[in-house]
Swiss-Prot record:
Its main location: secreted. One of its GO terms (cellular component) is extracellular region. Cleaved by the protease thrombin to yield monomers which, together with fibrinogen alpha (FGA) and fibrinogen gamma (FGG), polymerize to form an insoluble fibrin matrix. Fibrin has a major function in hemostasis as one of the primary components of blood clots. Keywords: Blood coagulation, Coiled coil, Disulfide bond, Hemostasis, Pyrrolidone carboxylic acid, Secreted, Sulfation. The modification Pyrrolidone carboxylic acid is found at Q1. The keyword Secreted applies. The keyword Disulfide bond applies. This is Fibrinogen beta chain. The gene is FGB.
Length: 18
């Protein structure tokens, strides 16, 4: 899972393309 690129339910990380 690419949590660093896309956050599933965790808004702690900022995704590049949302």
């Amino acid at each position: 899972q690419a949590s660093t690129d896309y956050d599933d339910e965790d808004e702690s990380t900022v995704p590049e393309a949302r």
